[in-house]
């Protein structure tokens, strides 16, 4: 899946263009344009760096369509709305986990050289609502935070009219459960 983030003039409504592997293209609406890293890039980078295949971007690759997405071109699969709703219900907890992990890594990225103990403390505080058997290590979180800092710097240097393009190459792990047989 290819995802392109155009750098628009400040204060315009931002968006990205999502080209899924099935040929369907969506426009994903985001927040206001500016020099701050868009929220959707943050999630893409964090999920990619932590290998999260069942989060927001893995869900989009698998066929989830969020309310902030507009179909641009390409033949949508049959029953796309029902399939998307089922995927969102089935993977709701994993999407929440991806949101919280993104927030955690964004917080770590804002710190000046955080220690492993500081990352562990933040992890405990920010992920306390999750049931995660084993969260990523402080080293993995620190590496994801560094990648996020690099992307934030790239975005801040980008002038209106430029764009950042990403490849989502992680495997699709979201699967639609089979409906129960009716008797």
Listing of model-derived features with the role each one plays in the protein:
Residues 46:
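Short active-site segment of divalent metal-dependent hydrolases/proteases
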